[in-house]
Every structure is written in structure tokens, then in C-alpha cells.
């Protein structure tokens, strides 16, 4: 019986994490008016010409990057080989 409770608790935590990630993705992709990051984050967080923005979710500030063309990743740290920039 205890094993079933552990499985249920694990499943509930999994659902909560999944819902949180979906919420962040939906908000960052669908909300055109993002707040700019504070200067100390804007200068350090996004790489390769990415633009830092913040979104407040459930009272917590979340900092993300909008990558310049040709880059991807949470901090725009990876070259996007699927969408290279013409040089």
C-alpha cells in the first residue's frame, strides 16, 4: 500500500512540474509585452546578441532570452543549424 502512495506522490509532482513548464512556455511564446531584464541580468544572461526579458509567474520573476537569428538555447548559447544566418 505504501508503494502505491509513493507512486501517486511521484505522479502528482510530475504533473505539477509539467504544468509549470507548459505555463512558462505558453506565456513566453504568446505574450508580446515582456518586461526587460534588470541591467545586471541583461548583460550576463543572454549570449550572441540575445535579448533578455522577464515574466512574472506566480509571484516569481523568470528571466529568459529571445535569441538572435542563427542561435538557440536557454541563453542563446547554441548555433541553430536548422536556421543558419546568411553571411
UniProtKB/Swiss-Prot annotation:
Keywords: Disulfide bond, EGF-like domain, Glycoprotein, Secreted, Signal. Residues 1-32 form the signal peptide. Expressed by the venom gland. This is U18-myrmicitoxin-Mri1a. Disulfide bonds join 37-52, 46-65, 67-76. Residues 33-77 form the EGF-like domain. InterPro entries: EGF-like_dom (IPR000742), Gurken/Spitz (IPR043403). It comes from Manica rubida. It comes from the Eukaryota. One of its GO terms (cellular component) is extracellular region. SUPFAM superfamilies: EGF/Laminin (SSF57196). GO terms for biological process: epidermal growth factor receptor signaling pathway. O-glycosylated. It holds the Pfam family EGF. Transmembrane segments: none annotated. It is found in: Secreted.
Amino acid at each position: 500500500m505504501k508503494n502505491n502512495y509513493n507512486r501517486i506522490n511521484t505522479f502528482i509532482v510530475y504533473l505539477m512540474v509539467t504544468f509549470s513548464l507548459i505555463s512558462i512556455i505558453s506565456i513566453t511564446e504568446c505574450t508580446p509585452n515582456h518586461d526587460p531584464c534588470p541591467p545586471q541580468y541583461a548583460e550576463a544572461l543572454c549570449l550572441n546578441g540575445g535579448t533578455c526579458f522577464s515574466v512574472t509567474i506566480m509571484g516569481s520573476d523568470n528571466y529568459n532570452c529571445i535569441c538572435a537569428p542563427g542561435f538557440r538555447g536557454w541563453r542563446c548559447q547554441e548555433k541553430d543549424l536548422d536556421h543558419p544566418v546568411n553571411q
